[in-house]
Amino acid sequence: MKAEGIGWGKLFVAGEYAVVHPGHPAIILATNRCIRVTIETSNQFCLINTNNQKKIVFDDLNVRDEYWKFLIAALNVFYRLLQEKGCRFSSVSITVNSDLDSEDGRKLGLGSSGAIVAAIIKGLNRFYQLNLNSISMFKLCVISQSDLKVQGSYGDLAAAIYGGIIQYTRFEDVDMTGSISALLNTEWPQLSVSYLNYPFDLHWVVGWTGEPASTQRRVDWVHAFIENEKYIQLLDLSKKIVYEMIQSHDIESFLNGIRQYRDWLNQLEILTDLTIETSQIKSFIEICTQHHGSGKSSGAGGGDCAIAFFPHPVAINDILLSKGIMPLTIQIAKREVV
């Protein structure tokens, strides 16, 4: 028996930081750069990363290993579900292949942690033929990350599961203890994932700065301002900007939304004294603006990636490279409606 699972990478188009709060929308693009896993029957649990040849073999799921923690957590959650359902299960071998890293092994900031969890859950769903729908697989991903005390918007998990371009809003906090089956069958207040269909063509360029950034630490830093009156006003403004972008009927209004959200992030920087738009990201945006585009940091900022949209195709890769910015060839991942 063999099955494959794919977890798509992600790029935030708009809504970052605000989206960690329930009911605040984000627009997220799932990338065709992804993590693929192949799952096969085995006498022992075996995890293999073909990119760096790392490998671990173990007999039960109580194993602890920092490098493999996201995969092991996803396995644990899925096998608990199998147990609740009374399904027969066995140990498996999982081979991992990723194109979310650079050639020298550095992460590109495309959500590899979320992508690997989604790939495992999708692959196990096919392997054990549970026929779970997309929202149930998303919930399993969230539960597995919750077990690791990972906090955030979980928008990367939604993109990794669904593909396409999505509108996403985070759920209100849910008690993750108890029956997994019950959690899958319970409505999570304010959780929303839906595909966006724009009536105009999108052209974009993605630049990787080569500077790593820690999303968790940056989100935690901003969260300390939750009771600040100016921050609350910014959250309301974020919701307005993103909803207007979601409803865009032409490319110009969409590009204006990108500019507005860049300004929003700049205001957040001033309020929190956190560097989101680094000098390289600023350089990327300036180059794109000169070619009639609208750009911004994507995700937590402070490094990683920036994204810009244009009313027409552009050829600026050589210019970006001359500034030390690596252009990434990225298409939108296919939709996975289940």
Task: Please tell me what each predicted stretch does.
Residues 93-95:
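Conserved phosphate-donor
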Residues 97-99:
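Short loop/turn motifs enriched for small/polar and acidic residues
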Residues 109-131:
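DPxDG-like acidic metal-binding loop motif
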Residues 303-305:
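Glycine-rich active-site/cofactor-binding loop and its immediate structural neighborhood
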Residues 2-14, 18-21, 28-88, 101-105, ...:
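C-terminal nucleotide
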Residues 135-137:
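Alpha-helical scaffolds flanking conserved acidic
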